[in-house]
Amino acid sequence: MTATSDKVLKIQLRSASATVPTKGSATAAGYDIYASQDITIPAMGQGMVSTDISFTVPVGTYGRIAPRSGLAVKNGIQTGAGVVDRDYTGEVKVVLFNHSQRDFAIKKGDRVAQLILEKIVDDAQIVVVDSLEESARGAGGFGSTGN
């Protein structure tokens, strides 16, 4: 099978400490991303985790750095600032927020986030209008569709 540019995720390992992203299962949506060094995220604080990887996402996609559900549920750790554009070639770092009352230690090789490839519309036209079409939801915002 020949790989075409619209299906290729190119990964650059920037050091011997870097780990190639992996999928936890064959049908997983994301690729696990690994810490390349130890770091402690302070209680009620934040930190930037090095991965020592760079990547170029397939044509027509961007990379979303998303939280790992286990870190969130078990430890109060959330992921922030997660858009990686196709033309970014620097090291991908992961911003983590610690919402717990205790410091959170991350060891080299720990899975800290996941990379999800999402399709984008490159050539959307912007049209300024006087009003939008009515919808059942209307202007209802947060929590407006129920519990």
Swiss-Prot record:
It comes from Saccharomyces cerevisiae (strain ATCC 204508 / S288c) (Baker's yeast). CDD domains: trimeric_dUTPase (cd07557). Optimum pH is 7.0-9.0. Changing D32A: Exhibits negligible activity. Its cofactor is Mg(2+). Keywords: Hydrolase, Magnesium, Metal-binding, Nucleotide metabolism. Disulfide bonds: none annotated. DUMP binds at S69, G82, D85, Y88, K93, R137, F142, G143. Present with 4340 molecules/cell in log phase SD medium. Each trimer binds three substrate molecules. The ligands are bound between subunits, and for each substrate molecule, residues from adjacent subunits contribute to the binding interactions. It is an enzyme of class 3 (hydrolase). Changing F142A: Exhibits very low activity. Homotrimer. This is Deoxyuridine 5'-triphosphate nucleotidohydrolase. Disruption phenotype: Leads to dTMP auxotrophy. Changing Y88A: Exhibits reduced activity and lower substrate affinity. SUPFAM superfamilies: dUTPase-like. It comes from the Eukaryota. It catalyses: dUTP + H2O = dUMP + diphosphate + H(+). Involved in nucleotide metabolism via production of dUMP, the immediate precursor of thymidine nucleotides, and decreases the intracellular concentration of dUTP so that uracil cannot be incorporated into DNA. Shows a significant activity against dITP, another potentially mutagenic nucleotide.
